[in-house]
UniProtKB/Swiss-Prot annotation:
Biological processes annotated in GO: modification-dependent protein catabolic process; proteasomal protein catabolic process
Similarity comment: Belongs to the AAA ATPase family.
InterPro entries: AAA+_ATPase, AAA_ATPase_domain, ATPase_AAA_core, ATPase_AAA_CS, NA-bd_OB-fold, P-loop_NTPase, Prot_ATP_ID_OB_2nd, Prot_ATP_ID_OB_N
Protein's name in the database: Proteasome-associated ATPase
SMART domains registered for this protein in UniProt: AAA
The protein's annotated pathway: Protein degradation; proteasomal Pup-dependent pathway
HAMAP family linked: ARC_ATPase (MF_02112)
Subunit field text: Homohexamer. Assembles into a hexameric ring structure that caps the 20S proteasome core. Strongly interacts with the prokaryotic ubiquitin-like protein Pup through a hydrophobic interface; the interacting region of ARC lies in its N-terminal coiled-coil domain. There is one Pup binding site per ARC hexamer ring. Upon ATP-binding, the C-terminus of ARC interacts with the alpha-rings of the proteasome core, possibly by binding to the intersubunit pockets.
Keywords associated with the record: ATP-binding, Chaperone, Coiled coil, Nucleotide-binding, Proteasome
Function: ATPase which is responsible for recognizing, binding, unfolding and translocation of pupylated proteins into the bacterial 20S proteasome core particle. May be essential for opening the gate of the 20S proteasome via an interaction with its C-terminus, thereby allowing substrate entry and access to the site of proteolysis. Thus, the C-termini of the proteasomal ATPase may function like a 'key in a lock' to induce gate opening and therefore regulate proteolysis.
Lineage: Bacteria, Bacillati, Actinomycetota, Actinomycetes, Pseudonocardiales
Amino acid sequence: MPHGHPGSQPDEGGELSNGSSSGELTAQIRFLEDEIALLRRKLTESPRHARLLEQRLAEATERVNQLTERNTKLIDTLREARGQLLALREEVDRLAQPPSGYGVFLARFEDGTVDVFTSGRRMRVSVSPSVETSSLVMGQSVRLNEALTVVEGGDFERTGEVCALREVLDDGGPEGSVARALVVGHADEERVVWLAQPLLDSPLKAGDSLLVDSKAGFAYERVPKAEVEDLVLEEVPDVRYEDIGGLSRQIEQIRDAVELPFLHADLFREYKLRPPKGVLLYGPPGCGKTLIAKAVANSLAKQVSKARGEDHKDAKSFFLNIKGPELLNKFVGETERHIRLIFQRAREKASEGTPVIVFFDEMDSIFRTRGSGVSSDVETTIVPQLLSEIDGVEGLENVIVIGASNREDMIDPAILRPGRLDVKIKIERPDAEGAKDIFAKYLTDDLPLHADDLTEFGGDPAACIQGMVQHTVERMYEETDENRFLEVTYANGDKEVLYFRDFNSGAMIQNIVDRAKKSAIKSLLDTKQPGLSVRHLMDAIVDEFAENEDLPNTTNPDDWARISGKKGERIVYIRTLVTGKNQETGRAIDTATNTGQYL
């Protein structure tokens, strides 16, 4: 052992130093690896942290937005609450204010004060600076505060008493203009009132109805008189002379009386001929009296518009349509007042050079013979009122009175004399030729006709219509037992048989055609065969005659005869002669014999 290798000790020391260096390196390597792992872990965790931060930032931003929106809503709510508080405060202040009074403005003065009428007194008050005194007009309402200061201008009064204007007084009012008028109020009480500003610019005539505040003493506006305004036919009737059948002679007479003086006024002046003042249309009911009056209004309106160069579509007729019973009033003098208003309105329109027609329908109801009244004597004052209007001291120029009546014998003779109702036109019941003309107005070739009837006339609608009219008229006017209607006994013992043709009228013919058309419609619905046929017209005649059997009752058959158009000897007895009326159904015919059953 002592002889070991030399240098062995130094080798061991070298190995030890090499081993420690190796351990340090290993430790350093491990440390570095740990550092690398830490760095790698941090590098891996860094995006996750960034995302977390971004998420927190987004949440914070969203919360800020929510808080901002909430803050905005709170601001709006506070602003609205503040506005409501201010409104409530204003409402409380307004409710706490004392009440305001109203007055009527009368006049203004240079010192800025004004006169008003309030609480039944005339007072001079001051005006608020916010009110322009120059804008206030006479009669205007003004609002006053508790100190009686004018704080606001208002409108004109719209309610009050209706008074009639008697006359306008030509003296200066507070504003230096015509401002006073004499009016008549309730119970003919007269008073002088101021005219408000709206009335100063409008023409006023005696008789106008004015709205009056009797306490303030002002008239504010003109009130339309419905009782007269409603009488004017602003819309022209659509009835022409061509639409009237069977009355060509009567139409010519009334055109000569009404239209000729207007169309050829120069010739009338040259021949010193005054146009007639009135026309009486009389005759049985349903024969066209009112129809002619409508045609006169239509024709006259077109003639006036043509003379003025206006479009006929804009034509207006000055046609005062007066229904007789409509004028009657239980108060004494009211009917006469209405008549005066009617003719006053007619004179106003006629003064413009336009012809005016005053049409009295059922004239016998109000202008009957004086002294003939049983329960009243209203005609003793109504008739003189009409007479004085037609040819009194105040003449009627360009005004024509047309009366219609089926009892002309009851009209006062003073009205019917020449110079008043000059022209008297009898509207008679249509004869056979007149009936054909009337049928032609209702049966036209554009109506659907039955195939059998068309075939009979070779398919010509015009010839078919003409044949149907011919057959119908022959059936109505033939003197057969089927057409016998009544046997009348006169006071002298004579008897006369009256046929249905003696009671025919234009209204009856129209009714027959309407019945036939309705039967044609029912036949179409039942049998599917369209068209109007002669058979429908024949059945319509039978039905119409059957209805005329049962006439209203009267105790005086002579009165019925006068209305129906039969004049002459007094009738004392009437008996029906209706036989064979509805042979198809075998209906029994009742023959009534009690006197006066038929009116």
